Amino acid sequence: MVKFQIEKKTLLGRLGKIDTWGSVEVNHQTPSFQTYLRAGHIPHLTWEVAENQLKLEQTHIFQMTLPTLVSNAKIIEKFGKGAAKFCGMPAGAAVHLTPFDPLGKLPGGYNDSKSVAIWTANGKVSLDVKMWREIINSFGCGSIETLVDYDTPKDVGQKKLVKAVDRTKTFQEQLFQQDEKVNGERIVSLGGGFSKYHRRKCAVDVGLAENIAGYTVEFREFTEGKETDDKEMKELLEETFSPLPPTKLRCISGPFNPKTVLFLVQQGIDLFDSSFPVKLAEEGHAFCLSDDFPTSSKYEVVDFNNEKFADDFTALFDGCACYTCTKYTKGYLQHLLNTRELLASILLVIHNMTEYDKMFKLIRSSLENSEGL
């Protein structure tokens, strides 16, 4: 089971605790994040490096993304010991399985009444309910996500929006048919695009079913690099959550920057993922929070591709105790990026994930010191 409890509600968000995830005891404080995986690994890190150099505050809850593993689905099924063991993950890890990659492409126009499209290195895969159920049961993760028709951009027509919500409902009903076995705790996907009415309708249609451990909100149109409107996000989330039980875990997936994370925490989101720090690392960027975060939501992003750092032999960021900042300099990192060395991405992922982890610790501390409701 996913055992989650809210410990405190404030105007700035809610403090919670996840005691267990699946069969794994995690004692994980929220707001926090799932550790984003690609091909069953933290991008650019071996498990040995992750264990020895990536020092995070809490027990990992890993987010296993399907697109980089779907081509191995039959092999994993034949292997018979689950996806986590197949990928060499740490023993006893808490793992959540999602059909989508928060950093992957999801072009529109490819979903239909029987399946949603996911994109792999080899192209499009149409993921239907039967295939998804088989993958869920053979992968053996602690929790799973239901399918959602995500193809609801801002300019989507009313007819297509209605179809998207109806499909999301149908996918869920088919997945949990009475005579079908589905392993893993259920995290229900909530869609509806930019329509407040359809956000609420989708929540009512799929979010009030039995045996639900939590919810994940489809919000890819509001991630880093896209124009966002705080008022619009607030209204959509209010319509989504108002008809649902307030004590359930609330998740969201995608590369959200610190300012947006802080805003989403205020709207009651409990669990994010670490795709944002990975995205920055793969662009050759590192980020650092302002000294007064989260009183201020400001943060700095530094582009180490810039040749101005070539002769700079100071640490990446003063005061950061991560492996990267204590062992390497700006100039060396710029050299690694310039020569396209694999070590560059490793070092940037370590720093960015450490800073992202620190961000949530600061947010939790702020909530602890805030007046409760």
From Swiss-Prot:
Keywords noted in UniProt: Cytoplasm, Metal-binding, tRNA processing, Zinc
Cellular location(s): Cytoplasm
Needed co-factor(s): Zn(2+)
Co-factor binding comment: Binds 1 zinc ion per subunit.
Pfam families found in the cross-reference section: TGT
Residue numbers binding Zn(2+): 320, 322, 325, 351
Assembly and oligomerization: Heterodimer of a catalytic subunit and an accessory subunit.
HAMAP family, A to Z: QTRT2
Protein name from the UniProt record: Queuine tRNA-ribosyltransferase accessory subunit 2
